[in-house]
Amino acid sequence: MEYAKIAFKPEAKARMNELIDNLMVSMKERVDGLKWMSAETKKQAHAKIASFKRKIGYPDVLRGYVGLTIDRKSYAGNILRANQFQLQRNFKDLGKPRDKTRMGMTPPTVNASYNSTNNDITFPAGILQPPFFNFNADDAINYCAIGCVIGHEITHGFDDSGSRFDADGNLKMWWTDSDRKQFEERADCVVKQFNGYEVQPGLFINGKLTLGENIGDFAGLTVSYYAFKKS
């Protein structure tokens, strides 16, 4: 939390919420513009977009590390005690309702994620620093940087894997059979494109294995660009 107090101010969190709001609108408009998708599936996609939850910077409730002993003289000892501390905490959580508000990453972590079973996106304070995010920068900078990351994570809710989960995080096919076939035909174009990339002599990318990330990159950039044009 001390890191977040210094590195991620409340006004920065408000700005991130604004960016996410705008990208959600852009994503909905992109879905509306899909000529191959039926009105039935679009309705379900709208419901999923509206149900997205977000975790920005740091959790609202911090569990802390009371009871964990840190010794400056023993790095190995600190690692051992930290692992034991976390293991005991996990044991105490057994049998309790799952807390969906917890973040799967610490505030200083430089990363972002989408959780299909919660239908939520997470952006720790660590990634909300330059060059990804700069509160004092103009829209062009932030939509180009963190905007693409936001778009990428939102898109994971509709890629080859995330699209199999509904707005409530249930593993449920909410697409019509025809729409799913249309999606898979288009996704196969991305698979074939990346199958053709030779990273080393005779070694090619597995486009099917990287499909979700590639869809996220393509669509994330597009969604962020259209959101920027309206900013």
Which residues make up each language-model segment?
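Intrinsically disordered, low-complexity linker/terminal regions across diverse proteins
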Residues: E2-S231
